[in-house]
């Protein structure tokens, strides 16, 4: 896995380079962000249609979790990683790059790389126990679940026993990749199934209509 953090820093929109898919994703973006759909829409630069507007963290949380409940550390971390100019907002291209990683057809390496970055809270190049604990607790809370601190610590202990093969008290990128390949369910929350068919149907929380072919 490349340590240059390709999934968040890349300018590629990956699974959303196709114009029909970009337009469909923009419909979701418009609905969630409330952008004026008539303003500056449709400018073409080098054969690519450019879309405009901005989305805040709360709106992005709805895109990730398909609910308007309180945002979580997970969605906040994803948002911050793709907010490349650190203005607290995502433009459409940043939004497309973020959701591209969550597409069912996105390369597994991109999902592994982004998941590592999410747990590496301090961006140090390795995962600490505290980073794992914060995200485990946040993910459970976002799912409407809660566990005692004792059970959470037990989960983290087991994770580090399996992952920290170098016995350094941390998990580096190589160890994380090995762990994920042994336990693919660790990437379950890195895939949003609704994105697979985004050109034919929107998630029900956004729209109840179909995208027309153009």
From Swiss-Prot:
It comes from Arabidopsis thaliana (Mouse-ear cress). GO terms for molecular function: calcium ion binding; kinase binding. The modification Phosphoserine is found at residue 204. Gene3D superfamilies: EF-hand (1.10.238.10). One of its GO terms (biological process) is negative regulation of ATP-dependent activity. GO terms for cellular component: cytoplasm; nucleus; plasma membrane. Belongs to the calcineurin regulatory subunit family. It holds the Pfam family EF-hand_5. This is Calcineurin B-like protein 7. Acts as a calcium sensor. CBL proteins interact with CIPK serine-threonine protein kinases. Binding of a CBL protein to the regulatory NAF domain of a CIPK protein lead to the activation of the kinase in a calcium-dependent manner. Signal peptide: none annotated. It is found in: Cytoplasm; Nucleus.
